[in-house]
Amino acid sequence: MIFMRTEDVRRDIPLLRDHVYLDAASTTPTPLPVVRAMTEYFKEYNANTGRGAYSLVLRATRKLQEAREKVAGFINASSDEIVFTKNTSEAINIVAGGLRFRKGDSVVVPNIEHHSNFLPWLRLRERGVDVRVVKADEGGVVDPGRIEDAVDETTRLVTVTHISNALGTVQDVKEIGRIAHDVGALYLVDAAQSIGHMEVDVRAIGADFAAFPGHKGTLGPVGTGFLYCSTDVQGELEPLMLGGGTVLDVSEDGYVLEDFPAKFEAGTLNIAGFIGLGASIDYMNRIGIRRIQKHGMKMTEELHATVSSIDGIECYGDPQNIYGILSFNINNMDPHDVAKILDETAGICVRSGHHCAIPAMKHLALHETGGTVRASIHYYNTSEEIQLLGETLEEIAGMG
């Protein structure tokens, strides 16, 4: 098999012709083969899935199932363990709202999580759940020992983000999963920043649940995501929404739910989006996830070395334990001003602000100053782009 090179991928993404795109942690530009797969659906078999017996419906239904199987294979799961969602946030909320929590249960969550893996758990306090927030170290690393100190026989669930969206720190998700299971707790991994950047094997890390986006590392379309729910724990979860496609039978007296995952997918899905997601998994496999990870490690090292060497710049996160993401600030400049200058002077796209992770910013005493500038990479980024970022940042730092 001939794997795709970085230059091959760049040719497939027209947006990269005019922009240095360093915001993969937010979303990624869509390759043409993914766009073509979605366009084919709209042009050739634009019909609803599972609702009818004519040929267009059957083709659309088959394509959607193929996409589910591709997604499952990519994370070493079975297709009947995959629930399609609109994003990672919805996937996490399905678990937070669908588990049968009782007063006195506890949940353990780190303090540097994205809001999507923090707010749903905080809200459980309204139901009498003890939400225990574990502090990361100054580099953004969650010490498994602190998780171990926080769990006990009341712990219903432990959750952690694989890679911090704010700092890029990589957590020991396998060890944290072991700790959760040792006390009989369920385990959820937010894999929003790791999927498509490195191998994510849900069975190897011991996840009962894992939440994923389609539009970040996997280069899929926006409006797509998915929840992995292990067959072993599917009986623990109740659907948040009911409607078309979720029931086997209904009467005036009640209803009988469909099996997993159909009972969690109420109404018409984003069919074109998920067909595009299936195409993006094909695209990932054409590149090779190990090649992506090797390139990502190289780019991360170059990114940190380049940016951290500039006078007046402070970088955040443990440099020995980050991947794909670098947060930094220049002197006392507002992060949004830095991002605007990068865009206007060099066409460089980066994120600025709190990154939907205000507790993480408060942990680093960066909340009041507006957060950080964040650069994040993927397989399509090059050493030349990192060099341009460094040169432009040097010019900006010289303004201060």
From Swiss-Prot:
Cofactor(s) in the UniProt record: pyridoxal 5'-phosphate
Superkingdom: Archaea
Keywords: Pyridoxal phosphate, Transferase
EC number: 2.8.1.7
Catalytic reaction list: (sulfur carrier)-H + L-cysteine = (sulfur carrier)-SH + L-alanine
MF term (GO), any: cysteine desulfurase activity
Coiled-coil residues: none
Record GO biological process: cysteine metabolic process
UniProt entry tagged with the keyword Ribosomal protein: no
Pfam families associated with the record: Aminotran_5 (PF00266)
N6-(pyridoxal phosphate)lysine: residues bearing it: 216
EC supergroup of this enzyme: transferase
Record bears the keyword Transferase: yes
Similarity-based family: Belongs to the class-V pyridoxal-phosphate-dependent aminotransferase family. Csd subfamily.
Protein name: Probable cysteine desulfurase
Gene: csd
